[in-house]
UniProtKB/Swiss-Prot annotation:
Interacts with the viral polymerase; this interaction allows the initiation of TP-primed DNA replication at both viral DNA ends. Binds to ssDNA. Interacts with the replication protein p1. Part of a DNA-gp3-gp16 complex. Residues 173-266 are annotated as: Priming. Residues 256-258 are annotated as: Interaction with the viral DNA polymerase. One of its GO terms (cellular component) is virion component. It is found in: Virion; Host nucleus. Pfam families: Phi-29_GP3. Acts as a primer for DNA elongation during viral genomic replication. Acts as the small terminase protein during packaging. Recruits the phage DNA polymerase to the bacterial nucleoid. Primer terminal protein (TP) is covalently linked to the 5'-ends of both strands of the genome through a phosphodiester bond between the beta-hydroxyl group of a serine residue and the 5'-phosphate of the terminal deoxyadenylate (dAMP). The record marks F230 as: Positions the 3' end of the template strand at the active site of the DNA polymerase. This is DNA terminal protein. The lineage of its organism: Viruses, Duplodnaviria, Heunggongvirae, Uroviricota, Caudoviricetes. Residues 74-172 are annotated as: Intermediate.
Amino acid sequence: MARNSRIRITNNDKALYAKLVKNTKAKISRTKKKYGIDLSNEIELPPLESFQTREEFNKWKQKQESFTNRANQNYQFVKNKYGIVASKAKINEIAKNTKEAQRIVDEQREEIEDKPFISGGKQQGTVGQRMQILSPSQVTGISRPSDFNFDDVRSYARLRTLEEGMAEKASPDYYDRRMTQMHQNFIEIVEKSFNSDWLSDELVERLKKIPPDDFFELYLMFDEISFEYFDSEGEDVEASEAMLNKIHSYLDRYERGDVNLDLKGF
């Protein structure tokens, strides 16, 4: 295997090195002065004589050129009216993830809006009509993120929350986890509301056998499958034996395949 020969420094190398170092230092100084961001640890400025090979020098040169390139949004910054500074890359990433999270929620709402809403065993309109009366987030338990506007960010803590939250919500896995958590929470609240009762014990066992995504659709479609009627402290339980029987009847329909569930793979 051929070894890289030791670099022979030319006058052109010296001129290019001096130019790159000057541009890099100017950018570091300008960014520090204008935005209060210290980039000195982001890039190395070794002595020209320290480069052992031409390949090593060329790699360093490429890093310097990328660092000072205005198209590199990782090192282009924006300061808003509250004095919060962020790179254009971070701002664009949050905006992109916000749009994707909104798209996922919008798609989900379109999938469920025509489903029947049933209360007391009778259809009382559709899930979409219920979302108009209440709000989509009240009905589904899932909020649609607001549009991202960097000018509205008042603190770095808020910026981090948006960055992490939108990255999470832009993933379909996030909504799968929400459905799983909702399913588990409902099972637990039924257990705690009645402690031990044969009707509720049987209901719990039946609920455990339902996949989380199926449960989510049942939760949307059947009024009695609601957190509002149960209390984990056992102090304000509105769910009656008749209501438990009604939920059992809904699960009978589900187990017979009489309930149209089509959010599979959402």
